[in-house]
């Protein structure tokens, strides 16, 4: 005898055939109200029935021309999956999205007649970026407007998984545009594919994978950070295994650790002295620095790490020769 939020529903996705919650499938499909009509309650397993309900909506359909203009100006700097997913929804025509839910927890709605509703999490979550900036600036005697009002002095990067693309490329810009208060919109949409664990999707309920807290307790943090970037799912899903992590640890230990150790040990050096660097090798280092910086600016973090590891091979070769 209650209205259920989309996350409290489950159904079979008509696109990929997998079971999904009612808000969005892992394949990216957002169930329509017709598809939700045959859904099941996650809590009790009973089939749901459709009744009229009253919610507040953001009129994305009215904002589509402004959103399209924003996307056209920025999308060339986005990851390819973000470009494709965003273009797909714009081509279909943006649908108005409900911004309220029937829940007893969450951000309250300060609108008469909606006091028992709560804000949809992906509305308050993205607006939380602005709120967090305001809070930080308030505590540090700074002006939050220098980041969130139009400025040529900063760039805004939205980093997330591919299942959250539209919240950052369409809904968040739509919310800011609707405020009509000259807010800065995201410059870069940095959306990754999925990272799997031993060829399976991470799942807390099924006990597949490890939490980040477990990982930093059991593994070397520096190696873990390097491995996750080196093996990052930038263009396709990738797989995490302990064996691959160990291989990265051994690779960087051998190529960097041994190079530094044998160089200092060979000369009995405890501190690095002043000296003259081989001009040719210095030029290689400067070129490498430029190349890596360019890759980072293009959001090609994996390629940047591979350039660093590749240069370690050159450094070891230089030492041997």
What are these regions (language model features)?
Residues 1-57:
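Cys/His-rich short segments
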Residues 4-7, 21, 32-33, 79, ...:
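Alpha-helix initiation/capping motif
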Residues 6, 37, 138-139, 146, ...:
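Polar/charged alpha-helical tracts
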Residues 6-9, 14, 18-23, 184-194, ...:
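Short, charge-rich amphipathic segments
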Residues 15-16, 40-269, 298, 304-308:
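Structured secondary-structure scaffolds
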Residues 236-249, 287-289, 314, 318-321:
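Surface-exposed loop-to-helix/strand elements on domain peripheries
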Residues 259, 263-266, 285-288, 292, ...:
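Amphipathic alpha-helices that form helix-helix packing interfaces
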Residues 271-293, 318-321:
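Acidic, turn-prone loop/beta-hairpin segments
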